[in-house]
């Protein structure tokens, strides 16, 4: 299969608040907006990144699946300066902190916050892994 695009779609009844959150804190811009669906795009890098927000009661969702996302989802944001993002998002903007900033032996410096829907957001800077974890990577690091 040739994939032309791939992006998460968050099912939530908080369409407007969710779109505002990702625009204000993560630099996304609206590319399509209806009362039941918002398509967002972040063009700060190449390739650009997309995220959509959809009312779970919309007719395009199969009947048995029409419910808001409720846990079990983490969106990872890899950034150049995780410490600066921590300062901006946690210290200044006051977003909730679920996992304080720390280095992981498998090759990440990160912290975890969440969006208005309770979706976890893992803000990550890739760092060199420990020797033990370096062997687990397919490509040498």
Which positions does each model-derived feature cover?
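Conserved active-site tyrosine of GNAT-family acetyltransferases
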Residues: 18-23, 89, 118
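Conserved beta-strand-loop-alpha-helix junction that forms the acyl-donor binding cleft
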Residues: 12-14, 105
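Helix N-cap motif at beta-to-alpha junctions
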Residues: 14-15, 80-82
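Vicinal oxygen chelate
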Residues: 1-6, 29-77, 86-114, 126-141
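Short glycine-/small-residue motifs
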Residues: 122-123
């Amino acid at each position: 299969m040739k994939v032309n695009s791939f992006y998460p779609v968050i099912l939530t009844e908080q369409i407007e608040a969710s779109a505002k959150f990702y625009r204000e804190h993560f630099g996304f811009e609206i590319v399509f907006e209806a009362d039941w669906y918002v398509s967002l795009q972040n063009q700060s890098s190449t390739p650009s990144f997309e995220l959509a927000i959809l009312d779970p009661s919309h007719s395009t969702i199969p009947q048995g699946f029409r419910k808001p996302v409720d846990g079990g989802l983490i969106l990872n944001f890899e950034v150049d300066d995780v410490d600066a993002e921590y300062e901006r998002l946690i210290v200044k903007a006051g977003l909730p902190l679920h996992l304080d900033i720390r280095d992981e032996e498998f090759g990440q410096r990160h912290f975890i916050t969440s969006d208005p829907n309770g979706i976890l957001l893992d803000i990550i800077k890739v760092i060199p892994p420990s020797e033990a974890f370096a062997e687990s990577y397919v490509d040498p690091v």
